[in-house]
């Protein structure tokens, strides 16, 4: 363990110090609940006491099962990090527009992989916690939570009344095991080191007293932004799901200064009829990410939100990689890029077959070296060795870097579709489709029919007025690219399912679209 006399500041002590400077100040809002600085401090300290009674020590792991984006998700993590433990969230709902609960078996797998011996749960998940406990081979210590505003905690049914006041904060080796969103497959557990998490949380906010709105789960990397805001003396507004009307109302009512969303959510806001009349004047920083955005839609977004947009490209494994800053959004030629490397990150483009670095402008795999690179996949050293080689994360993304350092992405390496001997990037086709008037969002993918010939299919969300026909969409793609790039089958969705990082759940879209028929209540099919 590092010498504590020379240890860096613990981000949770900074958060609690800022929260209690004015203990009556609201610091967390959730539903109709307001948590003040004093309440946050006392709740964290009471959970510290509970975790100690449960036998939690440095480098142990704590599993958390609460309602999505409940304040308890923050409180328990802060307490666990103070006693030197890591956290794994098994709440796991792919919330957003559509909610899909994780099976018990998946929750148990996540808990076991992380090595958690303590399960902390809220009242709404008490029965599920018992089911998980009965399913796990080794008996868990169960810590129950009351309403977030009450701060009540119990250990195996015994109420915890004491509030830890004097203690020395510990620093765990791992901060969290983050499970990837599983947009295309089974979620994987990514180990994030406490050192990199702590440094990121303490880097400071861009503006004093920020008010941050999150509509994506704080079980994911948005939690790092929440920590940065609270450590800077700001406040956070936690929402359980995304709705464009709610977003517009929240920004005006709570004078939100910063927010975080997926590209699909940004598109939904642009398409809302009240977007042009809502009061968005308080916004100073709108960070969006998840996939490359259509330049046409970004021009529309920049007109609605001038001077505040920033696009981030990153991954759970690599952390932040690039940023397209607000000033970059004023230059049309840069809107097809995802920006330049963030400070401390080095990007290389390598030949996927030879591993050699490629020259400027050539397309290859994006590989990354930086301070937020994961420690590895939990309980999977072989997969870790494939993804991290000599300290470089192999992202699996096709991309290129121009002479100024701007990165352009061309889709996932394994998602390239071969149509009539032509390699087609679904991401590039999606950008063209979303650039067509009347298209809100698009998801393009490969499909093999009975003859096993690969075809290009597309799922689209269309606007309520002036929606283009499927033939119009085919012609639009054929003119902008080639006829080979035009999808032969379209499925119209009312809205796409969104996972807990704000990305479109591509696997779900493909599965439902493949089974869809013309009489489906959710989709309209054309071929």
UniProtKB/Swiss-Prot annotation:
Enzyme type, top EC level: ligase
GO biological process, one term: novobiocin biosynthetic process
Pathway: Antibiotic biosynthesis; novobiocin biosynthesis
List of residues binding ATP: 180-188, 312-317, 397, 412, 503
EC number(s) on file: 6.3.1.15
Activity-pH behavior: Optimum pH is 8.0.
Protein name, as recorded: 8-demethylnovobiocic acid synthase
Gene giving rise to this polypeptide: novL
């Amino acid at each position: 363990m590092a010498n504590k006399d020379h240890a860096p500041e613990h981000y949770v002590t900074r958060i609690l110090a800022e929260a209690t400077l004015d203990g009556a100040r609201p610091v967390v809002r959730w539903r109709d609940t307001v948590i003040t600085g004093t309440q946050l401090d006392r709740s964290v300290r009471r959970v510290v006491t509970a975790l100690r009674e449960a036998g939690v020590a440095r480098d142990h792991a704590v599993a958390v099962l609460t309602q999505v984006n409940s304040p308890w998700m923050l409180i328990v993590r802060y307490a666990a990090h103070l006693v030197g433990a890591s956290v794994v969230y098994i709440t796991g709902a792919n919330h957003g527009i559509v909610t899909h609960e994780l099976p018990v078996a998946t929750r148990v797998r996540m808990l076991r992989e992380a090595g958690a011996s303590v399960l902390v749960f809220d009242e709404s998940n008490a029965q599920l916690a018992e089911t998980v406990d009965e399913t796990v081979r080794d008996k868990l210590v169960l810590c129950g939570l009351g309403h977030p505003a009450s701060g009540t905690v119990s250990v195996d049914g015994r109420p915890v009344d004491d509030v830890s006041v004097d203690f020395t904060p510990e620093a765990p080796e791992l901060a969290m095991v983050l499970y990837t969103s599983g947009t295309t497959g089974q979620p994987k557990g990514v180990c994030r080191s406490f050192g990199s998490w702590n440094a990121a949380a303490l880097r400071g906010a861009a503006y004093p007293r920020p008010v941050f709105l999150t509509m994506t789960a704080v079980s994911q990397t948005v939690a790092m932004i929440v920590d940065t805001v609270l450590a800077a003396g700001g406040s956070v507004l936690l929402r359980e799901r995304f709705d464009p009307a709610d977003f517009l109302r929240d920004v005006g009512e709570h004078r939100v200064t910063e927010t975080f969303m997926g590209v699909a959510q940004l598109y939904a806001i642009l398409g809302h009829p009240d977007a042009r009349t809502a009061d968005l004047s308080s916004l100073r920083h709108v960070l969006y990410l998840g996939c490359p955005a259509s330049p046409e839609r970004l021009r529309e977004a920049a007109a609605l939100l001038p001077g505040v947009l920033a696009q981030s490209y990153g991954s759970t494994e690599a952390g932040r990689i690039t940023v397209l800053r607000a000033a970059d959004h004023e230059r049309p030629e840069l809107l097809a890029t995802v920006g330049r490397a963030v400070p401390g990150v080095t990007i290389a483009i390598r030949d996927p077959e030879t591993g050699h670095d490629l020259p400027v402008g050539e397309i290859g795999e994006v590989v990354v070296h930086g301070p937020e690179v994961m420690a590895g996949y939990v309980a999977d050293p072989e997969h870790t060795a494939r993804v991290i080689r000599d300290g470089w994360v192999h992202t699996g993304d096709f991309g290129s870097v121009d002479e100024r350092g701007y990165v352009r992405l061309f889709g996932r390496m394994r998602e390239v579709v071969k149509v009539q001997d032509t390699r087609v990037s679904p991401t590039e086709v999606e950008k063209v489709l979303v650039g067509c008037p009347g298209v809100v969002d698009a998801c393009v993918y490969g499909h093999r029919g009975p003859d096993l010939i690969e075809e290009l299919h597309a799922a689209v969300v269309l606007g309520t007025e002036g929606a283009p026909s499927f033939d119009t969409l085919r012609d639009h793609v054929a003119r902008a690219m080639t006829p080979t790039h035009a999808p032969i089958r379209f499925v119209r969705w009312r809205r796409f399912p969104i996972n807990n990082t704000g990305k479109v759940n591509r696997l779900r879209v493909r599965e439902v679209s493949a089974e869809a028929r013309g009489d489906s209540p959710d989709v309209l099919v054309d071929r």
